[in-house]
A protein has these predicted regions:
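Hydrophobic packing residues within well-ordered alpha-helices of enzyme cores
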Residues: 16, 61-65, 120, 173, ...
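Residues at the starts of beta-strands that form the adenosine-phosphate
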Residues: 47-49, 128-129, 203
Length: 233
């Protein structure tokens, strides 16, 4: 059984308000993308890597791969308009390897740890799909569609905040999307959500993440990431 790390780096990062896509922003002397890829590349349990990027940045990423000597990177693939489009590009690239374990990771989570990747790989021995997550610490409320008023308060003890990587056997995530595309009302939020909805018989295991494994979403997050990068683990 081989394990493939899929680094999703095709987003525009518009919410940062910066002209440079967030995965190419500098962080501790490297780009955000380099931090994410390097951790996966260094992990002994990762056999291959695929990086999915916007087509306009393929040459740039191929140059980064060469500069870093990342010999586990087998392909730099063009991403799609939506996140699930980018996931599918990688899924279809391994169509001939249905039992391959695929770990999908947001490039914008540069502080993913070796421990998280190890635990995700181990969890895939028990489950056909997993998600990295951490317990919710704030009370979560449900509101009306306009966000005007509360409609209910959720039981915090049952709620977890999703992170990445998310892991699947290739055949499972491919089947989930095949079923989803039969639904004219299909709208994808993430890969695990697609499995939960369209393959209800598949249990999605939980792997405990880390508060350090934050996603770069807004420009202010860069300062926090710089601090966490320099702070003792």
């Amino acid at each position: 059984m081989s394990t493939v790390g899929v680094i999703l780096a095709a987003g525009s990062g518009s919410r940062t308000g910066l002209s440079t896509p967030k995965q190419f922003l500098p962080l501790g002397g490297k780009t955000v993308l380099e931090h994410s890829v390097q951790t996966f590349h260094n992990h002994p349990g990762i056999d291959e890597l695929v990086i999915v990027v916007h087509k306009d940045y393929i040459d740039q990423v191929q140059s980064i791969v060469k500069q870093n000597g990342w010999n586990k990177v087998k392909a730099v693939l063009p991403g799609g308009k939506e996140r699930f489009d980018s996931s599918l590009v990688a899924v279809r690239a391994y169509a001939d390897h249905p039992d391959t374990v695929m770990l999908f990771h947001d490039a914008a989570r540069p502080l993913v740890s070796e421990r998280i990747i190890t635990d995700a790989i181990k969890a895939m021995e028990r489950f056909d799909a997993i998600d990295v997550a951490i317990p919710a610490v704030d009370t979560i409320v449900q509101c009306d569609k306009d966000g005007t008023y509360m409609t209910s308060i959720q039981d915090r003890s049952l709620l977890w905040r999703m992170q990445t990587p998310q892991g699947f056997r290739q055949r499972v995530i491919e089947q989930a999307y095949n079923e989803a595309f039969k639904d004219p009302r299909f709208t994808a939020t993430d890969d695990c959500g697609t499995v939960l909805r369209y393959l209800p018989g598949v249990k999605v295991g939980i792997v405990r993440g880390s508060e350090r494994n934050i996603k770069l979403t807004y420009a202010a997050d860069l300062s926090l990431l710089e601090f966490l990068l320099s702070a003792p683990k």
